[in-house]
From Swiss-Prot:
UniProt family annotation: Belongs to the WD repeat PWP2 family.
CDD domains: WD40
Species this chain originates from: Mus musculus (Mouse)
Location in the cell: Nucleus, Nucleolus
InterPro entries referenced in this protein's UniProt entry, alphabetically: G-protein_beta_WD-40_rep, PWP2, Quinoprotein_ADH-like_sf, SSU_processome_Utp12, WD40/YVTN_repeat-like_dom_sf, WD40_repeat_CS, WD40_rpt
GO biological process entries: ribosomal small subunit biogenesis
Name this polypeptide is given: Periodic tryptophan protein 2 homolog
Amino acid sequence: MKFAYRFSNLLGTVYRCGNLNFTHDGNSVISPVGNRVTVFDLKNNRSNTLPLATKYNIKCVGLSPDGRLAIIVDEGGAALLVSLVCRSVLHHFHFKGSVHSVSFSPDGRKFVVTKGNIAQMYHAPGKKREFNAFVLDKTYFGPYDETTCIDWTDDSKCFVVGSKDMSTWVFGAERWDNLIYYALSGHKDAIVACFFESNSLDLYSLSQDGALCVWQCDTPPEGLRLKAPRGWKADILQREKEEEEEDEEEGDRETTIRGKTTPAEQERVGKVKYSRLAKYFLNKEGDFNNLTSAAYHKKTHLLVTGFASGIFHLHELPEFNLIHSLSISDQRVASVAINSSGDWIAFGCSGMGQLLVWEWQSESYVLKQQGHFNSMVALAYSPDGQYIVTGGDDGKVKVWNTLSGFCFVTLTEHSSGVTGVTFTTTGHVIVTSSLDGTVRAFDLHRYRNFRTFTSPRPTQFSCVAVDSSGEIVSAGAQDSFEIFVWSMQTGRLLDVLSGHEGPVSGLCFNPMKSILASASWDKTVRLWDMFDSWRTKETLTLTSDALAVTFRPDGAELAVATLNSQITFWDPENAVQVGSIEGRHDLKTGRKELDKITAKHSAKGKAFTTLCYSADGQSILAGGMSKFVCLYHVREQILVKRFELSCNLSLDAMEEFLNRRKMTEFGNLALIDQDAGEENGVAVPLPGVRKGDMSSRHFKPEIRVTSLRFSPTGRCWAATSTEGLLIFSLDAQMLFDPFELDTSVTPGRIREALRQREFTRAILMAFRLNEKKLAQEALEAVPQNEIEVVSTSLPELYVVKVLEFLAASFEESRHLEFYLIWTQKLLMSHGQRLKSRAGQLLPVVQFLQKGLQRHLDDVSKLCDWNRFNIQYVLAVSKQRGMKRTLEPVDTEEDSDASDEDSLHLLRAAGEEEEEEMLI
């Protein structure tokens, strides 16, 4: 088994905080999600998270005009220069202060950041290699409060900065003689956004109270004059002074009097001036809805404003005509962005974690995604690995597509937190348990709740399990310590299993036998036999409270996680412990800012809360109250690899040691409400509160892993944590893993064998080298009529390798029919021999089925659409042939005559029929 799993995607969370951006082509949205960045491709319906992370939550993102570079700045002021082409970090930089916004100039040569009450302009990184990618050019002073927003003119000559001191400042990017800086006032609240008009120095400024000021400049952009160098200026001033002295002498001779302007008046002559043309108010009279975000499209003169109540307005400027107004959420609209064409508008709501893309002309949603409001608790893979279902504390159940990364259905029938989710073996039914006292079954075809299982007395269910046939549903209670068993077909309660003396923490059915394993806080694991009237077959005594239980895929082994950070392995047939793992030191828990004790002592109360076997059963994943997920080898009982889910220091319990400089005699400085001016201040959680309303919105949520699952294909695994749903997968492109390699296997010899038409030898050498491009070249070089001969000559060991390659190629390659022929010939030739190793080949077969099923769905939809269109066209063409031509309008006499003629014809036809009948 390979262990080179790497982070591949982040699901379950679509937006946290920061500003949204559209890419250069306008088809993708770049959204900051915690300390990561996700790119939503709206054209191809895919989402992908960049393989990079900052130390804190991302605060602002700036894109270069060509869309190739991005500057990502977190809350601590650390910046990353990222290439969106190769998806890698090019440079690290620290601004040594909190940055509110960053913006590139339209020509891409410079960028400006607003930090504190100043604005700093840097030279943008070029295409050549440089020792320092960020070179400071100028620092602009003026505002006395924090600066909030930036906008550039189209020619990159000037930029405008808004501030919390209710003023707007226009600065020159170059040393202009008639514009150094210009301060504009007239607002009664902090500036939220400011925008230049297209090809003009006219600008708009918006404040938090919903006021819009229109400013007109008396100078066009071409009227800006460069300031002369100091040497030239001194010569010019000296020349002017000499001319003035000569004029004075001539005046004395001719007794004429000439007036002089003061130096202040001379300074004002020829300078840029602004005047306020109009002032509009976005709020109605008596409405105190705060403006939170705004965006302006210069080509179409479209202004989009978002408010704290979840409402957004569309106005046409400068006439301020209202185009549209809509409420999209109950929470504040934190960010607004418009794409390059001006058709799509992106909205981000940080409170609910919503990301919306609205097409304002057709008044329809292009994208509408929302994560779980509270933390996710449980997850499950579908049998084919295509879908992931998650349940959260907000009572919602969401189904995610692993290929696109989007949630395509949200089930909201539960009225309280979801505690467990699972798929049936068919993959068409989802079963969930909740604290509202119900277990529900959902149909994935119609997205409806077709079964609701309840207990005779109201109880809170903590876990759920379904047997391999999909007919038996069981759920454990955390208050009555009982296990309830229902029938899926009838919905009737079959039995109530009693015996546990503590809350039931986990349930799991044996995949091969009719045995149910239940773990409880009473330090026991009970095995119940379904065919023996649900009697207790065995009781496994543990040394501590059981927190999780799971069976190996072949059902021959049982793993239990306990409160003392141990994982014990049992033989379910003989009820004998076969191994144990001590994982206390592998968890590496951190210290929370509220903890009075060190991380070393608090680790005694931390343990693994979720377990999952790999697809082949050789390894097991374990996660719990830590930022790490541990991968153990079951037989050797050793730690193989430890995966760090997050490095986000905005979460609590991330560090093992706290900064002693923050520990004062009054307590930890982190608990002092320092950000009261931002929104609602810092909410400190109540003692003992781990989840719920206070936990989801307090300043630093605690990092923890709530659920782990391996994909049935074995290529990836998923984890639900405070950060969201993270997927780790095997990246074949980054891994060189040869198979039975020797010195005779080289790319040159592989291509030489292909030229000599020795296809079998070339394929064997290509898979021994295990290079994807060489394997693809070797397989695609085989003529279609020789595939059957080559496939029969392959050894059985290499057949599995070829099937794995074909399964991966179905997700990328366009040669669908060619690879289908390869798959068919391999399975027909080696199917009987592969059947003897069905257990080991199950991940490969499921991986193959996943790719084939996706192509089947796509092709079937396209074929159905074409077939229905052809049927419609044929039906319309037949109806057109049946239509009669329009008759000319006749006079009354002609119409009477035609009526009489028709009557005569009818009578004549009737007489002929009577004669025929008589004959």
